[in-house]
From Swiss-Prot:
This is Thiosulfate reductase molybdopterin-containing subunit PhsA. Binds 1 [4Fe-4S] cluster. Residues 41-97 form the 4Fe-4S Mo/W bis-MGD-type domain. Composed of three subunits: PhsA, PhsB and PhsC. Its cofactor is [4Fe-4S] cluster; Mo-bis(molybdopterin guanine dinucleotide). It is found in: Periplasm. [4Fe-4S] cluster binds at residues 48, 51, 55, 83. The lineage of its organism: Bacteria, Pseudomonadati, Pseudomonadota, Gammaproteobacteria, Enterobacterales. It is an enzyme of class 1 (oxidoreductase). Component of the PhsABC thiosulfate reductase that catalyzes the reduction of thiosulfate to sulfite and hydrogen sulfide, with menaquinol as the sole electron donor. Proton motive force (PMF) is required to drive transmembrane electron transfer within the reductase. The PhsA subunit contains the active site molybdenum-bis(molybdopterin guanine dinucleotide) (Mo-bis-MGD) cofactor. Residues 1-30 form the signal peptide. Predicted to be exported by the Tat system. The position of the signal peptide cleavage has not been experimentally proven.
Amino acid sequence: MSISRRSFLQGVGIGCSACALGAFPPGALARNPIAGINGKTTLTPSLCEMCSFRCPIQAQVVNNKTVFIQGNPSAPQQGTRICARGGSGVSLVNDPQRIVKPMKRTGPRGDGEWQVISWQQAYQEIAAKMNAIKAQHGPESVAFSSKSGSLSSHLFHLATAFGSPNTFTHASTCPAGKAIAAKVMMGGDLAMDIANTRYLVSFGHNLYEGIEVADTHELMTAQEKGAKMVSFDPRLSIFSSKADEWHAIRPGGDLAVLLAMCHVMIDEQLYDASFVERYTSGFEQLAQAVKETTPEWAAAQADVPADVIVRVTRELAACAPHAIVSPGHRATFSQEEIDMRRMIFTLNVLLGNIEREGGLYQKKNASVYNKLAGEKVAPTLAKLNIKNMPKPTAQRIDLVAPQFKYIAAGGGVVQSIIDSALTQKPYPIKAWIMSRHNPFQTVTCRSDLVKTVEQLDLVVSCDVYLSESAAYADYLLPECTYLERDEEVSDMSGLHPAYALRQQVVEPIGEARPSWQIWKELGEQLGLGQYYPWQDMQTRQLYQLNGDHALAKELRQKGYLEWGVPLLLREPESVRQFTARYPGAIATDSDNTYGEQLRFKSPSGKIELYSATLEELLPGYGVPRVRDFALKKENELYFIQGKVAVHTNGATQYVPLLSELMWDNAVWVHPQTAQEKGIKTGDEIWLENATGKEKGKALVTPGIRPDTLFVYMGFGAKAGAKTAATTHGIHCGNLLPHVTSPVSGTVVHTAGVTLSRA
């Protein structure tokens, strides 16, 4: 059945969030009102998916309808706490705007004309087109992208079986800079022991809005215990408002301040010399690189007074090793992302806070923990080994630049899909398969994305909603929500081993299916069935658990299991508790720590303050240093963005409860700037640059620099399902140019714009 936009269903109101159901044939959307509270009640443990951190949860269900979600008390770091996004999962499941049947585009891309089809027809047509593209252009011409985490593993399994090396997560548009910096220096990332820190410095990392429930609670605990917090941020974020000090740093000035702090620590010998000598390489090159980066120099670069830089550095060092410079998350402020994140890790290294209470630490999975304990404390997870699984032979499109070798091995440079499609280099991309990925909100330069999808031969979107990106697809495959599916066991180890399990809470609505099942069935239609030896998720879970039925039962009952005691390798009291628990543990060092067991997966086996590998890949990048770059023109204002506590990037603006909580992203304007432009709060304004033009509303506030404008990201969608949050506000991607930072491969989230009244 085919239908035009004029014949589509009319909108049904849910508060202010569901402005219209958009353009769908009858039966394509969900109709599932929440049942009353009378009836059989169950509590099911699972994992949240309202953001990428996957907090353990419990869902209360009445008559097969989810009515309440809370944190899982079996997970002590979080307990029953949950954020607004996690609690809104009820609204997600029962949203009448959900896609619940496969659909095929019948009109121009993005115009919203769809036809309901069967799963079999969808699989047959998509597989036929993929195989035709493979035959003509090679399997590498099909790109696969997904949100990070469990959603990506099954899609990437399909990509590998199909023969394509081009798999991507959203990492290059969000957290990759931090992870790549850690990989360059140490071979792997580090976590924060926030609850026990005495001093924390943040460069734009806003844990009170970019919420990670456990870390956010730890931050509150640290502040209650008297820890000092210092925020360097161009705007007064929620974290800045709760910090002891807020310094309105110039956008892009972070690296200069970090280099100056390093200069002070080395010049005044405030660093942990014994740690540096034992665990690092390249200190001499680092010291030479920061010899001239004085606080006075940085003050001119960043608008932070020199005496503030000196004082904060001294205070930070005085609290070491129980002190942290937060490595951050989504915040590519400039082209110098890789060096900024490296300098943050470098300051932590100079503090000697690695594997110390209130510092940074390596996560300890079952294999590591069991080895140290001298016995099997926690079960290890078996890795799926598929016999004769093919290995793609073509080069990845993002490895045309060798500097991206680190991110290519992880989430990849997703915006390279645009480059390849538009330039046909190193070879053309002809198809794009997306799983819960909304690049139209997260990738910069929206106009380039439109050009990209318009010239592709095939675009497939697997999603819960008709997102802005899904609106440009040829086929929509309805995925069920995280509360309607089972998934693999997740390793959530931190200071000791821990596993968690996402399991089905309620039955799927309509014909929606789990993404693992969708990609498995498409793989079978592609003739790749031999690479799918499992029949259901329970079989795969049991394989991971090495056939341990008792463990599987316990994990399903509790949803979260952990083993052992917290272990910090260089903290004597922590090691004492560990060895008391496990008498057969390996011998401690003479100082009663496990300092000799601290290893790093870098080429030298140490923390590399100077990277010979990076210097070879990109001359001049061996050590961090400031380089000339421009974020805006002289007549422009800085344009920056950030996260808000009630939304996740561009993913949750469709969820009714969250859309009601926040449905617009007013532009923060300093009173001085507003007066110069004749602008008042609530006025309609234009932001414009060479990339695009956006209309929004002004919010005049002193909580922003006079030369800077700020908005929350994820609003102002120009296609897809219509809610209050998607139809209002500034679309950030329409104002950010297509700029990729070196080495990290991340998109730059700062630009220049002009401001005027509408």
